[in-house]
């Protein structure tokens, strides 16, 4: 596996490749990330991964400086998963001058849910993903369903900007107790780690209620919010939305069997966790 930091060297290395599969990450790789690499292998060749902790998608009070950086361990894991090139640029490589041009998602998708609680987050994501796509020029790119809103925004961005890349969605990988794998799970204390699977269990109960015929979605959302709060969580949102556009479904859409997803974000101690389940 080649480890490359220069954009020009990356382009030289990939010149002539027309089936490249790309997996962008921020590093601190776990089994969830590695499952994306294996899925990418099924859809293209060679597989290119990137590791770049993107300052643009961190808010002023978020964890950019303490975000775990484990490049040498990550390199070993990628080598074991047959990745052809790791693109690991420095901040100077990616942003040699201030990034004045940004890619902004529409407010009706980028300003809700995660976007409401993390202003500017999706502008940072869209900007860096567009720049990475320009560098790698993949035929397919793999994103995880765990970041459901991000997946939807990136897919729509590629469609509307006519970027010649197919976005592949990867299922969320979970620990044995149901907790979705995340680089931020390492921030949890021992007691918090024991409590953390309750987020997924709460979403499962919401899902089961909807599938069981409950149509008062607001009541389900409020009950879930209250349940987590009583256990010491600080929920940002629990929302049942249409999968197609993350808008709340109408009564008619519910009766017609509109595909739904329940999404949640909540703090447990100092750690903010997100999760979702399709319904």
Swiss-Prot record:
Catalytic reaction list: (R)-pantoate + beta-alanine + ATP = (R)-pantothenate + AMP + diphosphate + H(+)
Enzyme Commission no: 6.3.2.1
A cellular-component GO term for this protein: cytosol
Keywords for the protein's UniProt record, in alphabetical order: ATP-binding, Cytoplasm, Ligase, Nucleotide-binding, Pantothenate biosynthesis
Subcellular location: Cytoplasm
Note in the entry: The reaction proceeds by a bi uni uni bi ping pong mechanism.
Protein's name in the database: Pantothenate synthetase
Originating species: Burkholderia cenocepacia (strain HI2424)
């Amino acid at each position: 596996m080649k480890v490359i930091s220069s954009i020009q060297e990356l382009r030289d290395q990939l010149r002539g490749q027309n089936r490249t599969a790309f997996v962008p990450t921020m590093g601190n790789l776990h089994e969830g990330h590695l499952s994306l690499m294996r899925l990418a292998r099924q859809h293209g060749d060679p597989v290119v991964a990137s590791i770049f902790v993107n300052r643009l998608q961190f808010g002023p009070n978020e964890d950019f400086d303490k975000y775990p950086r484990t490049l040498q361990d990550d390199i070993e894991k990628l080598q074991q998963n047959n990745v052809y090139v790791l693109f690991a640029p420095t901040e100077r490589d990616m942003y040699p001058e201030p990034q004045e041009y940004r890619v902004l998602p529409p407010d009706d998708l980028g300003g809700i849910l995660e976007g409401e609680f993390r202003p500017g987050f999706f502008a940072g994501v869209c900007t860096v993903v567009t720049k990475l796509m320009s560098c790698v020029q993949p035929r397919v790119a793999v994103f995880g369903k765990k970041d459901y809103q991000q997946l939807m925004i990136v897919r729509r961005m590629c469609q509307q900007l006519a970027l010649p890349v197919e976005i592949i969605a990867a299922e969320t990988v979970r620990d044995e107790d149901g907790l979705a794998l995340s680089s931020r799970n390492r921030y949890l204390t021992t007691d918090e780690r024991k409590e953390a699977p309750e987020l997924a269990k709460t979403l499962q109960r919401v899902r089961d209620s909807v599938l069981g015929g409950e149509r008062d979605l607001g009541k389900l959302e409020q009950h879930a919010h209250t349940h987590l709060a009583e256990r010491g969580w600080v929920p940002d949102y629990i929302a049942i939305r249409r999968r197609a556009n993350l808008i709340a479904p109408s009564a008619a859409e519910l009766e017609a069997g509109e595909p739904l997803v329940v999404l949640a974000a909540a703090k447990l101690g100092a750690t903010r966790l997100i999760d979702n389940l399709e319904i």
